[in-house]
Amino acid sequence: METYQEKIKQKLTVVPIEPGCYLMKDRNDQIIYVGKAKKLRNRLRSYFTGAHDAKTTRLVGEIRNFEFIVTSSETESLLLELNLIKQYQPRYNILLKDDKSYPFIKITKEKYPRLIVTRTVKKGSGKYFGPYPNAYSAQETKKLLDRIYPFRKCDKMPDKLCLYYHIGQCLGPCVYPVDLEKYAEMTKEITDFLNGEDKTILHNLEQKMQESSESLDFERAKEYRDLIQHIHNLNKKQKITSSDNTIRDVFGYSISKGWMCIQVFFIRQGNMIKRDATMIPLQQTEEEEFYTFIGQFYDLNQHILPKEVHVPKHLNKELIQSVVDTKIVQPLKGKKKDMVDLANHNAEVTLENKFELIAKDESRTVKAIEELGDVMGIQTPIRIEAFDNSNIQGVNPVSAMVSFIDGKPNKKGYRKYKIKTVDGPDDYKSMREVVRRRYTRVLNEGSPLPDLIIVDGGKGHMSGVIDVLENELGLDIPVAGLRKNDKHQTSEILYGEQAEVVPMKKNSQPFYLLQRIQDEVHRFAITFHRQTRQKTGLQSVLDTVDGIGAKRKTKLLRTFGSIKRMKEASVEDLKNSGLPQNVAENLHHALSNNS
């Protein structure tokens, strides 16, 4: 059986070298850590190579799987990381858990507006800009703006001048008359800056920096320089979030090799709180598949209709509107279009990864059977059939066969057998009977023969099977045996006239394949034996009671559901199910004596 380490190793090979977030999962598929990276592949690989500190070592020790989301920038990755941490509360993200909401910069709606940092958005109370990745970024931006623009600072208008007036960071509207046009001009410049319309402001700031430098006011020049640098660092386009509170779902899709991946971003309070990726085989045109999908997406009450649904611009808006009863938007530019493009890109990445993993899995399984054939000295075993017996002290003996083609389970070829000619717990004779029955029928029907037969057992099992094949059926098919250790795990494969151990590394793909085959045939046999045991156990109790035929047996099962519940029932309960008094008493007695 392939280990989780092998699965992670394979998955790492298809992670793109792009910015994004990753989610680490434990053995219970619970998200235990969320992180971000400028280059996802490099960061994820670093977790599984080299030495780490104690905390990271503990984290890596619990990782059994991971997911990732591609973004368009590092800033975007950070904001998404915070969203995911708020949503999933991973226990390894201690430092980020306390951040309850994103910070915004707000220009208040007052006669003399103020510039404040807030985490609460109240409609109609002012203009909001953000969200910012963290409080430090927002506070630093406000601090620089305060130094450049003498906005009012006090919450309530005082009756005297404050310190900010004396250091040149406030015009003092509490005492002196202030030109409202000048104040409005400052407000517009700040608004432009916070909206990212920075070309004019950058030009003005660079000019002011030059003037300050020429007048030897280097401190003021440094402040202008810092503000210019801050604009470059913090005023990046952030596609993963929006500053408005509109509830919207954003759809994107990609197609490849007859498959379609539809990606949905759920935007709430301006933040992407969740995404959904669905893979569907293309049965119609891509547009028709999309219309069908989006109609079912909301019609089946799986998702609540948002205020807006954003979709790619080339789709038929009217057709979508006919199946989705909310506002349909097809953004043509700006952040909203960027978000649709990002959904398309994530759908494309999801498809690429899926096909790469499938291709690698195909290559790995084909390589596994080729190597298995080489190490055993036989032709590549394209078709493998494996047998296992199951019984308890010879009671209800059964056998099962599983079929693997090209290293993958062929469940249509699975077979179940009840042992008919063997009395008592005789594994060897049971195996002979089943192999005889299986390949006699195969020969009669002209069905394809396997390239390799595997039995769960050692030399004795192999000898019996070979004898039946060669001396009774005239077949020459390689037969191998699989032995388990004291922990009931596959330990070695036996092959050849002397049933010798075939040298094979335990971490090789052929060995993993043999483990999968042995585990699967054992599971199949055990399940069949359990079903048989339950059925015969039911018959052995109910069939011994006079007055209970097929109809009453069926009615009892429908009423009580199981023998266990019948045992818990009183005579009166049994009678109420439709049995005569004497039959109910006899059944109650039989059930009480059946352990």
Swiss-Prot record:
Residues 17-94 form the GIY-YIG domain. Keywords: Cytoplasm, DNA damage, DNA excision, DNA repair, Excision nuclease, SOS response. GO terms for cellular component: cytoplasm; excinuclease repair complex. The keyword Endoplasmic reticulum does not apply. The UvrABC repair system catalyzes the recognition and processing of DNA lesions. UvrC both incises the 5' and 3' sides of the lesion. The N-terminal half is responsible for the 3' incision and the C-terminal half is responsible for the 5' incision. This is UvrABC system protein C. GO terms for biological process: nucleotide-excision repair; SOS response. One of its GO terms (molecular function) is DNA binding. It comes from the Bacteria. Interacts with UvrB in an incision complex. It holds the Pfam family UvrC_RNaseH_dom. The keyword tRNA processing does not apply. Residues 199-234 form the UVR domain. SUPFAM superfamilies: C-terminal UvrC-binding domain of UvrB, GIY-YIG endonuclease, RuvA domain 2-like. InterPro entries: GIY-YIG_endonuc, GIY-YIG_endonuc_sf, GIY-YIG_UvrC_Cho, RuvA_2-like, UVR_dom, UVR_dom_sf, UvrABC_protein_C, UvrC. SMART domains: GIYc. It is found in: Cytoplasm. Belongs to the UvrC family.
